[in-house]
Structure formats: structure tokens, C-alpha cells
């Protein structure tokens, strides 16, 4: 949120915004002070940069700025301990920010960066597959794909790349191991690239060797579900309706119990952003 609002990309920081006059203060570790000045200037953010000094705690600095005013804090973004400490210095009220709702609508520059990250990941994946997967371990495939994305211009990977071969592919968040890709395996790869903080996220499954009738059937069902879900995406539609459109294909075929995750999610500076397309999603697209 701080990066999105101010452009600052450094480590731990706190941002205070005055409701009365809209003044803002960015509290940063002294090691990031110059960086904060440069990055907030470049992003044209109107914010006072305050250096956190060793002999004064962050909560004390916040209390000095807030004074006798009340401090609204989003409890989902701070620890209970920090909340308790703040309450010892100033009047604290719990209030959820609206930043998630604001951030889910991307501007043209954000969309361009996400598209760039997706393009890098897509091309890296194509190179990976052309080299072949048979006989390689999950870790080797992970390392090679990560290298290809960075070599193609990614600032970094978007998250820890997942590679799962054979039966391990049933684990959505499997950690790559020394398991080797064998003939007849399906290899699930979940990966993404990052460009200027913005991320891409895609999952691909490659069948090594002959494709069985059952595997072909499942491929066609997933493709049909994806097509139905994409077709249902329109302005004004509730997120749960998109999930339902995709999930209906699996329900029809009696395999919905195998679909243990949501249909999709937003993406940006975080890998998972609103809206989260699940049966519980009430957000309007």
C-alpha cells in the first residue's frame, strides 16, 4: 500500500495521513532515508519524510505527530502488540482502509507493467518446454525457469516458483523437490515474473509422454470451465458468478470435489489482490 501511494520501495515504513488537511508523513528507517526522498520525489508524492532514530521508538514518533488527535489504524495491517503500544501514547480507533477497493482498478501504466511481466514469464516458459522436462528434477526445472525469467528482463520472480511432477501435482502449493519427471507424468508449474514491482501469475500443466483418454478428458473440462469463466466476466457482475460459471462445468461432470481452490484473483503489486473469485466473492466487477 505504501509503495502504491508514495512510490517508496524500501523496507519497513509507516505512513500517516491527516484527515483534516491531507498532510502525509512517511516514517522510515534511517538506512532508507535518501531512497525515500528520491522515490517519493520521482513519484511526485506530497509527503514529509521522517527518519526513525535509534533512541526514539516508532510509536513515540507517531504519537508526537498525532498529538491529541485520534489515530485510525487498520488492524489487518499491524500486529496486536503494535496496536497496544500505540494505545499507550494516543487515542486509537480501528478503521478499515479503502485501499484494496481502490487498488483493484488498475490504470494504463499498471496494466502495461503487468502485461510486460506476463510476456516475460510466457516466453521463459516456452523456452523451458522447448528444452524438455523429462529426466529433470523439480528443483532443476524451478531454477532454470527462474533464471530464464530474470535473463529476459524480470527484476525478480513474482513468488516462489512451484514445480510438481506426477502425483505431487495434486498439491497446489507443493515445494519443488528432488522428484524426477518421468514418462507419463503431468508436470504442474505455477510461476510469474515481476517488473517494477508488478507481478504476473500463471499455472501450466505439461504432459510428458503419451496422453491417456482420462487425461485428455480432464484437459477438455478445464478448458471448457476456463472459457465459461472468461465469458462471464463483465462489468457489474458479482465475482461469485464468475466462479460459479467455471465451477458449473465440474459440477455437471461430478468432479467438483477435486476443485479445491477459487477460480482466480486480482494481481498487481501483490500476487493476490482483490477481487478474489471464489464462491464467497461479493465484489462487483
Predicted regions and their residues:
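Active-site neighborhoods and metal-handling regions in enzymes and metal-associated proteins
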Residues: 1-285
Amino acid at each position: 500500500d505504501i509503495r502504491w501511494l508514495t512510490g517508496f520501495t524500501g523496507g519497513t515504513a509507516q505512513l500517516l495521513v491527516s484527515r483534516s488537511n491531507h498532510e502525509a508523513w512517511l516514517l522510515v528507517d534511517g538506512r532508507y532515508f535518501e531512497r525515500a526522498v528520491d522515490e517519493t520525489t520521482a513519484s511526485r508524492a506530497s509527503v514529509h519524510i521522517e527518519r526513525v532514530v535509534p533512541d526514539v521508538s516508532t510509536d513515540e514518533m507517531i504519537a508526537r505527530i498525532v498529538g491529541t488527535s485520534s489515530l485510525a489504524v487498520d488492524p489487518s495491517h499491524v500486529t496486536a502488540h503494535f496496536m497496544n503500544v500505540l494505545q499507550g501514547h494516543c487515542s486509537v480507533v480501528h478503521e478499515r482502509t479503502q485501499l484494496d477497493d481502490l487498488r483493484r482498478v488498475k490504470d494504463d501504466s499498471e496494466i502495461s507493467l503487468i502485461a510486460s511481466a506476463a510476456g516475460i514469464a510466457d516466453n521463459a516458459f516456452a523456452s523451458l518446454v522447448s528444452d524438455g522436462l523429462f529426466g529433470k528434477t523439480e528443483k532443476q526445472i524451478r531454477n532454470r525457469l527462474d533464471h530464464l525469467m530474470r535473463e529476459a528482463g524480470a527484476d525478480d520472480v513474482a513468488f516462489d516458483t512451484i514445480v510438481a511432477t506426477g502425483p505431487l501435482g495434486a498439491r497446489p502449493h507443493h515445494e519443488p523437490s528432488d522428484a524426477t519427471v518421468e514418462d507419463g507424468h503431468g508436470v504442474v508449474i505455477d510461476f510469474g515474473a515481476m517488473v517494477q514491482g508488478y507481478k504476473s501469475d500463471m499455472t501450466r500443466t505439461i504432459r510428458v509422454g503419451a496422453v491417456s483418454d482420462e487425461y485428455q478428458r480432464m484437459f477438455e473440462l478445464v478448458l471448457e470451465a476456463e472459457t465459461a469463466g472468461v465469458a462471464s466476466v463483465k462489468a457489474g457482475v458479482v465475482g461469485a458468478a464468475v466462479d460459479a460459471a467455471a465451477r458449473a462445468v465440474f459440477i455437471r461432470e461430478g468432479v467438483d470435489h477435486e476443485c479445491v481452490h477459487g477460480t482466480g484473483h486480482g494481481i498487481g503489486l501483490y500476487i493476490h489482490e482483490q477481487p478474489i473469485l471464489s464462491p464467497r466473492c461479493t465484489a462487483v466487477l
